[in-house]
From Swiss-Prot:
The gene is ribD. Substrate binds at S173, R189, L209, R212, E300. It comes from Chlamydia pneumoniae. Residues 151-376 are annotated as: Reductase. Signal peptide: none annotated. This is Riboflavin biosynthesis protein RibD. GO terms for molecular function: 5-amino-6-(5-phosphoribosylamino)uracil reductase activity; diaminohydroxyphosphoribosylaminopyrimidine deaminase activity; NADP binding; zinc ion binding. Residues 6-128 form the CMP/dCMP-type deaminase domain. Keywords: Hydrolase, Metal-binding, Multifunctional enzyme, NADP, Oxidoreductase, Riboflavin biosynthesis, Zinc.
Length: 376
């Protein structure tokens, strides 16, 4: 393992930071940042903003204030080595005769997978790998997981009262948390490419499930709303079927044919699966999302869906918001019966906690040996 200086770590952390600017718009590509340094001074920066657009390295070179020959380049993910919508970034760095390249992470995508690093070294460029590795892994976690497992990273998000109730006695769950927490949820939605919701939540709250900025404006890229409804119980007039964001309706043979025709007239695509004891076939849903190269799935309820996903081991992370209220025993828990005894309960790792206004956000991660999905 290389020993890197604090200054070198600073430059890599800057590359990771600017890479986050593409977090919402870059998927299914990774949100990569690049910094060009000459004589310990940043002369160029760039990040990958959208699929099909210029890569971080190309933009950093374009934005450089002087020729970059002999410079050091810091990039949060291995430069690509293949021809796609853009030429290989490794070739670009070779062409501009950079001196050294610092890479936080090897790209697990089979199209790259160390080949970019090999190309640079074959051209006589010094390459150092692993600087800022943990920070880059945290930033690119959904991308890394999807490219490694060919499966989306799944976050179960919920808002609950201090005493753990996710809804009141009438089943209403909106406005449990403060505005600051709801703004954070809007960003979390924007960072996801799909939102899963069960029919009961739609019937109770009639949510939009759109990703909105604090000022109320929509984020430039909206997630796919995936409505799971095995019997056709969600009214076609529900807000999730409006044109603000794309929607996928998932159902079973129990759904009336006339209902599907109505959705067809609204241009809402329908995915038919076999019936299961918990409703729709979640494995078929995830197969569909994997085919669409969805990197991150956000689950927004309700209790039945949460329970099914945890039992089937689809959930990787929990994001829990606690609101400033006590609802009492409403029989509205976050999760239903899992059948766990204390000694066999899923181990969680606390990743972070944050005060948002008058609410508390806590992020937990389920241990890797637990969250590998059970494949049919």
């Amino acid at each position: 393992m290389e020993d890197f200086s604090e200054q070198q770590l600073f430059f890599m952390r800057r590359a990771i930071e600017i890479g986050e600017k593409g977090r919402i718009t870059a998927p299914p590509n990774p949100w990569v940042g690049c910094v060009v340094v000459q004589e310990n001074r940043i002369i160029g920066e760039g990040f990958h903003a959208y699929a099909g657009g210029p890569h971080a390295e190309e933009l950093a070179i374009q934005n450089a204030s002087m020729p970059i020959s002999g410079s050091d380049v810091y990039v949060s993910l291995e430069p690509c080595s293949h021809f796609g919508s853009c030429p290989p970034c490794a070739n670009l760095l070779i062409k501009h005769k950079v001196s050294r390249v610092f890479v936080a992470l090897v790209d697990p995508d089979p199209k790259v997978a160390g080949q970019g690093i090999a190309m640079l070294r074959q051209a006589g460029i010094q390459v150092y790998v692993g600087i800022g590795e943990s920070e880059a892994q945290a930033s690119l976690q959904p991308y890394l997981y999807q490219r490694t497992h060919n499966f989306p990273w799944t976050i179960l998000k919920s808002a609950a009262s201090v005493d753990g109730q996710v809804a009141d006695s009438q089943g209403k769950s909106q406005w449990i948390t403060c505005p600051e927490a709801r703004h954070d949820v809007g960003k979390l939605r924007a960072e996801s490419q799909a939102i899963l919701v069960g029919s009961r939540t739609v019937l109770s709250d009639d949510p939009w499930l759109t990703a909105r900025q604090p000022q109320g404006m929509l984020y430039p890229k909206q997630p796919l709303r995936v409505v799971l409804d095995s019997r056709g119980s969600v009214p076609p007039t529900s807000k999730v079927f409006d044109k603000t964001s794309p929607t996928l309706y998932v159902t079973t043979e129990r759904c009336p044919e006339n209902y599907i025709k109505v959705l067809d007239s609204l241009d809402v695509p329908v995915l038919l699966t076999e019936s299961t004891p918990s409703g729709v076939d979640l494995h078929k849903v995830y197969e569909y999302l994997a085919q669409k190269k969805i990197l991150q799935v956000l689950v927004e309820g309700g209790t039945t869906l949460h329970t099914s996903l945890l039992k089937e081991r689809f959930v990787n992370s929990l994001v829990l918001y606690s609101g400033p209220m006590i609802l009492g025993d409403q029989k509205r828990p976050l999760v239903g019966v899992l059948g766990n005894l204390l000694e066999s309960a899923s181990p969680l790792t606390l990743k972070s906690s944050q005060i948002l206004g008058n609410s508390l956000k806590v992020v937990w991660e389920i241990s890797p040996q637990v969250f590998e999905p059970i494949r049919n």
